[in-house]
Design a protein with these regions (language model features):
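Extracellular or exported targeting regions of proteins
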Residues: 23-186
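Bacterial N-terminal signal peptides that target proteins for export
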Residues: 1-9
Length: 186
């Protein structure tokens, strides 16, 4: 009985997720350079949905961000950020939280560097931001995962005079897709 209930809940949850629109921030690998010393430099881009913005917040703790988890072999000093972003690397990657509890549960391997870029200037809805890079000593391809915190504008309540739109923080998690061009990297 409990197995049937559990399977039913899992199926309904999966259907609900599949039915929801798949529009949200994406972090993608745009280029990989194989360097003369055998290291690999990864270039990332962040793509925002039309309904999302990135806000610096009142402090780093409240600012929107993107974290790429488990970047094995990170070479110190190699990560670069575009203007309006600040880089950090922590053993436990920054993850969106609410009242101290994680909103998403990425696989975060202990003692493995994570790449976190925190926004320091507002980013408009629908933007694509390029210029995130990091170099690794590892030449093998490893599946990646990312999480992000974004700001979404909730619509005003219809019929309520004077009701304005309200910003809402949202958490995202996704697989870092390996682009097809990586098959050619040797």
């Amino acid at each position: 009985m409990l197995k049937t209930l559990g399977a039913s809940l899992l199926l309904v949850s999966g259907l609900a997720i599949a039915a929801a629109p798949a529009v949200a921030l994406q972090t993608v690998v745009t280029q990989v350079d194989k360097n003369a010393n055998g290291s690999m430099t990864y270039h990332f881009a962040v793509k925002l949905d039309q309904g999302e913005t990135l806000s610096p917040g009142e402090s780093k703790a409240t600012a929107d961000f993107v974290t790429v988890y488990n970047f094995y072999g990170l070479i110190d000093g190699s990560p670069k950020s575009p203007g309006g972003w600040e880089f950090s690397s922590e053993e436990f990657g920054r993850t969106p939280t609410l009242n101290g509890y994680p909103l998403v549960l990425p696989l975060d391997v202990p003692n493995t560097p994570n790449l976190t870029w925190t926004v320091t200037k507002p980013v408009a809805a629908g933007a694509q931001i390029d210029g995130f890079t990091a170099t690794t000593r590892v030449s093998a391809m490893v599946p990646g995962e990312y999480a992000a915190q974004v700001t979404r504008q909730l619509p005003a309540i219809q019929g309520a005079q004077g009701a304005a739109t309200k910003p809402s923080k949202q958490a995202l998690i996704g697989a870092l897709p390996t682009p097809s061009f990586l098959a050619d990297v040797k």
